Amino acid sequence: MAESAFSERIVQNLLDTDFYKLTMMQAVLHNYPNAEVEWEFRCRNQEDLRLYLPAIREQLEYLAGLAISDEQLAFLERIPFLAPDFIRFLGLFRFNPRYVQTGIENDEFFLRLKGPWLHVILFEVPLLAMISEVRNRARYPAATVEQARERLQEKFDWLRREASAEELAGFKMADFGTRRRFSYRVHEAVVSGLKEDFPGCFVGTSNVHLARKLDLKPLGTMAHEWLMAHQQLGPRLIDSQSAALDCWVREYRGLLGIALTDCITTDAFLRDFDLYFAKLFDGLRHDSGDPLLWAEKTIAHYLKLGIDPLTKTLVFSDGLDLPRALKIYRALQGRINVSFGIGTHFTCDLPGVEPMNIVVKMSACNGHPVAKISDTPGKAQCRDPDFIHYLKHVFQVA
């Protein structure tokens, strides 16, 4: 009998999350322990999720019972930039359901988070994985792990046919597939398959639990929330990106040096990304807009600053599949180092399955609105049109 795609648990433990949530959480503990934030769920493809509300609430109750184990803490202790006080804090951490509101409003499912940033930050990824798997259990109950493995093997076969041995030797790819995965069981099977048989260079996973279980490197630095929160954490709005980068540098002293460019827009980011930051950070991550236009812009910026682009890395993570990644790799080969983070294309690709397009984004910090504009208009998010208008004015965004 074929192995079901679904196991009893959806979220396995506290480490079943993206690594950058932990790196940001440590920075919040050390720098902004009293910051208050609000988050809002959004389903970009307008799917009706009301039917799944009871199951989602049941999973929230399960989350509240999770505690990190001594073995998991020991794994984190081996990561040199995670500080002892942060490890101790994680040992005490519990998900608190009082910070989560769910229900139906205007005939639509809603989910909101409100509370201390330090205690809310870890909710995002498991919530998204829960909602995705609850919906998939209802819509695709007969799905099997073998279907995911077969799709993965087809992709490997395609890459072997299309790419030369020389190209494969430098084609670096990581799993970024936790938040919109079809199910945990599929996710584990996919990452195991990538480790064992990926034709290029599989460099690790963003999922901390799977990194520990499968002896892989956990990957990730910062997300949009880090830059968004700084819009209301004290500095002048025009200085918020610089303040976010500077705080990151002080926290990690040159480690975890991949910065995200599109919180406002890449043009606005590069105006703040001066020689100081460009030397300190190892590279940049692309998450919206045309990837090759973005790459040309960032390469030109490094050259203008007198920095050899071949000493820097560009990470691409915006809705990638292998054909898109290979196209980008070929266009930039020999000009700058590149790496790819692929998510849904690997972890939610089964026959007949339509992946969800869901996000949980920060909407306010310390009682005031924050915004993400991005290089793709459809990815913009802000609940206050006046604030986003002001933000565009301050950063000279059309």
Curated annotation (Swiss-Prot):
Catalysed reactions, as listed in the record: nicotinate + 5-phospho-alpha-D-ribose 1-diphosphate + ATP + H2O = nicotinate beta-D-ribonucleotide + ADP + phosphate + diphosphate
BP GO annotations: NAD biosynthetic process via the salvage pathway
InterPro entries assigned: N/Namide_PRibTrfase, NAPRTase_N, Nic_PRibTrfase, Nic_PRibTrfase-Fam, Nicotinate_pribotase-like_C
A matching Pfam family: NAPRTase
Post-translational modification: Transiently phosphorylated on a His residue during the reaction cycle. Phosphorylation strongly increases the affinity for substrates and increases the rate of nicotinate D-ribonucleotide production. Dephosphorylation regenerates the low-affinity form of the enzyme, leading to product release.
Domain of life the protein comes from: Bacteria
SUPFAM superfamilies: Nicotinate/Quinolinate PRTase C-terminal domain-like, Nicotinate/Quinolinate PRTase N-terminal domain-like
Keyword Phosphoprotein: yes
Enzyme Commission (EC) number: 6.3.4.21
Pathway noted in the entry: Cofactor biosynthesis; NAD(+) biosynthesis; nicotinate D-ribonucleotide from nicotinate: step 1/1
A cellular-component GO term for this protein: cytosol
Modified residues (Phosphohistidine): 224
GO MF: nicotinate phosphoribosyltransferase activity
Family note: Belongs to the NAPRTase family.
Function: Catalyzes the synthesis of beta-nicotinate D-ribonucleotide from nicotinate and 5-phospho-D-ribose 1-phosphate at the expense of ATP.
Name under which the protein is recorded: Nicotinate phosphoribosyltransferase 2
